[in-house]
Amino acid sequence: MHVVLAGGGTAGHIEPALALADALRRQDPTVGITALGTERGLETRLVPERGYELALIPAVPLPRKPTPELITVPGRLRGTIKATEQILERTKADAVAGFGGYVALPAYLAAKRLGVPIVVHEANARPGLANKIGSRYAAQVAVSTPDSKLRNSRYIGIPLRRSIATLDRAAARPEARAMFGLDPNLPTLLVTGGSQGARRLNEVIQQVAPWLQQAGIQILHAVGPKNELPQVHQMPGMPPYIPVSYLDRMDLAYAAADMMLCRAGAMTVAELSAVGLPAAYVPLPIGNGEQRLNAQPVVKAGGGLLVDDAELTPEWLQQNVLPVLADPHRLYEMSRAAAEFGRRDADDLLVGMVYEAIAARARR
């Protein structure tokens, strides 16, 4: 059996695809896996690092809104579809599993032409254009939110890395806090804006850090590799404020934390919900508003807080986040609510949907 994955561009598309690849290999070590990508996407690094074949196709960005560039898309797309067809034929693909992004649409159209079963996974609450089109031709459609608008979809959550999906935060906490140089007993706030960091979150947390420390809160802050580390003048006897450029072990960062301040990308929301880590979500104020929609269900369930980017101030953190971190019972209740909302088994469920799609084709 050979499965072709189509989910390049950003980590939000690539990580669920790789989680599916890992789950397929756990069930059948002989399964062939090829990931489609473009030469400018993160997949050029992430896919080979995980040991999977990467096949490059020309990038055809899809404008979010009608623009003059939209006229050129069909012509450029034809060449990319042809290149994708050649990969599907070379690998003798039994299924295409798509996750959105630049490479997904040509993969769906090439698979439709060749009669290869399509499985679509949509991570965002508001589907992107590629997955809207792909879902029309798909044998199986999986979504990450219960109220998705994609037709004939099945709610499974988002496939996660095993280090996250199997994480026992309480058991890993002593190791995690020791690794980051944190106090083993103090309430801990984790702050990160994702792989690239978030300037506004960085600015606000640096302003409010002294107040949090005075209240007995320690902070682990990933500023992002493109941002300068702040100068820290640690006062004797004060809880630590530890800025780092990047967190290689997000599982241990989650284990070390009691609460998180972060953006609301679909993968972030899924991971925090799965491990039961409550968060103050600050949706990125661009795009089509999908980050707010991503966070709303878990916030409604009681597993987090939600604040607009423009409303995030030191005063808001003092009034809303500090009381949570200072109240162990409230932290426990929010953690439980997040965990009850989260899904840890989406990777295995999606494997089942891939097998169902292949079996349905065989019966025809």
From Swiss-Prot:
Presence of keyword Cell division: yes
Keywords: Cell cycle, Cell division, Cell membrane, Cell shape, Cell wall biogenesis/degradation, Glycosyltransferase, Membrane, Peptidoglycan synthesis, Transferase
Documented EC number(s): 2.4.1.227
Alphabetical list of CDD domains matching this protein: GT28_MurG
Gene3D superfamilies to which the protein is assigned, alphabetical: Glycogen Phosphorylase B
Pathway, per record: Cell wall biogenesis; peptidoglycan biosynthesis
Family: Belongs to the glycosyltransferase 28 family. MurG subfamily.
Protein purpose: Cell wall formation. Catalyzes the transfer of a GlcNAc subunit on undecaprenyl-pyrophosphoryl-MurNAc-pentapeptide (lipid intermediate I) to form undecaprenyl-pyrophosphoryl-MurNAc-(pentapeptide)GlcNAc (lipid intermediate II).
Name of the protein this chain belongs to: UDP-N-acetylglucosamine--N-acetylmuramyl-(pentapeptide) pyrophosphoryl-undecaprenol N-acetylglucosamine transferase
Species of origin: Streptomyces coelicolor (strain ATCC BAA-471 / A3(2) / M145)
